[in-house]
Amino acid sequence: LTGAFTKPVANNILGALCEQKGIKVTTNWTVDSVEADRAVISSVTGDEIPYDLLVSIPPNLGQEFLIESEVSDVTDFIDTDKELLKSKKFENMYIIGDATNVPASKAGSVAHFEADVIAQNLMADIEGTDNYYRFDGHTNCFIVTGFEKASLIDFSYAVEPLPGMFPLPGVGPFELLGESHINYWGKLMFKWVYYNLMLKGHELPFEPNMYLAGKDTSLLRSK
């Protein structure tokens, strides 16, 4: 990564937050090895960083059996049309969640929004129409920042995370790319929402595709 986030607006805001909290962000750095006895990690270029507590996340890959079934790409994820969420090799196969190779986050919100799109497209197939919905890469995610505060990002394939209010434009109650106690409690509350509302099929005020209402789009125009 080139910063705290992959897109400029969020990178500037989250990068400043890291600096405020005394967190050093080391960019363009790929781990090559870990020396536990010295408590250092080394990069592929030979640079070293000492650590107190190391939390390492390995590269994500799909399952090997997908290669054998000839539905995957070179990373073992299923080769997926990023809008229709269909296999590029098998017309009657839909893919959802972490199994896809669409350029979106491997987040639970992505799978949820994909499910809404796929449900509509399955109905179109059953009814024999071409009234397909198209997934725009909609993703949102809480980021816990400490001391019972959190931030929130909401973005898509085409639109990067922007400041604003979510899910109700201008009302919220959650603040996009802002650090607040309400965001933190929203994250904690989501567990109850997931088990008691989402899994039971209740309607939620979250559209499968991202909307710009309530977001500071002037930051896009000024780029």
Model segments located where?
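FAD-binding beta-loop-beta segment adjacent to the flavin cofactor pocket
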Residues: 76-94, 145-166
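Flavin (FAD/FMN) cofactor-binding core of flavoprotein oxidoreductases
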Residues: 4, 134-151
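Internal hydrophobic alpha-helix adjacent to the cofactor/substrate pocket in enzyme cavities
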Residues: 111-137, 143
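Electropositive phosphate-/nucleotide-binding environments in soluble metabolic enzymes
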Residues: 8, 109, 116, 174-179, ...
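A Rossmann-like FAD-binding core segment of flavoenzymes
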Residues: 1-76
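C-terminal auxiliary extensions adjacent to catalytic cores
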Residues: 153-223
